[in-house]
């Protein structure tokens, strides 16, 4: 069973995949998207779904710190609905509060990566953290 984790932003989607047993998450890539042009990266996502034989999606929900939902939560849920309809694969949602902050801190403190390079990997690492949190909670 392979699970794909997604960190959906307004310009990119970070992608992570679980190992076949569902114990660990590995960051894969960042897919560029453009919400204004209705370009959501589904072609590339389709290739990854086939390549990894994905059984489930975990989409991060960027709730506010007071547990309320804002426009980004609605956008993530809309993205989840679209991929569920497109791929006929179940989608679950994982609270992703502070995962991007955690990812950035990891890149600064542990990897000493420059700001420019962090921007290129932050969403992939956030997707990995979202998926790993889900795996840790579920399995």
UniProtKB/Swiss-Prot annotation:
Pfam families: RuvX (PF03652)
Taxonomy, superkingdom: Bacteria
Protein name: Putative pre-16S rRNA nuclease
Enzyme Commission number(s) of this protein: 3.1.-.-
A GO term from the CC aspect: cytosol
Family note: Belongs to the YqgF nuclease family.
SUPFAM superfamilies recorded: Ribonuclease H-like (SSF53098)
UniProt function note: Could be a nuclease involved in processing of the 5'-end of pre-16S rRNA.
UniProt KW keywords: Cytoplasm, Hydrolase, Nuclease, Ribosome biogenesis
CDD domains xrefs: YqgF (cd16964)
GO MF terms held by the record: nuclease activity
UniProt KW Cytoplasm keyword: yes
């Amino acid at each position: 069973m392979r699970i794909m984790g997604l960190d959906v932003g307004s310009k990119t989607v970070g992608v992570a995949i679980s190992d076949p047993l569902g114990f660990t998450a590995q960051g894969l890539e960042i897919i560029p998207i453009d919400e204004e042009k209705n370009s959501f990266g589904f072609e590339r996502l389709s290739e990854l779904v086939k390549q990894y034989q994905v059984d489930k999606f975990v989409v991060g929900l960027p709730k506010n710190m007071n547990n309320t939902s804002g426009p980004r939560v609605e956008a993530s849920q809309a993205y989840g609905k679209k991929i569920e309809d497109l791929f006929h694969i179940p989608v679950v949602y994982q609270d992703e509060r502070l995962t991007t902050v955690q990812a950035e801190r990891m890149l600064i403190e542990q990897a000493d990566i420059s700001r420019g390079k962090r921007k290129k990997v932050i969403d992939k690492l956030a997707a990995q953290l979202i998926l790993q949190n889900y795996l840790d909670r579920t399995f």
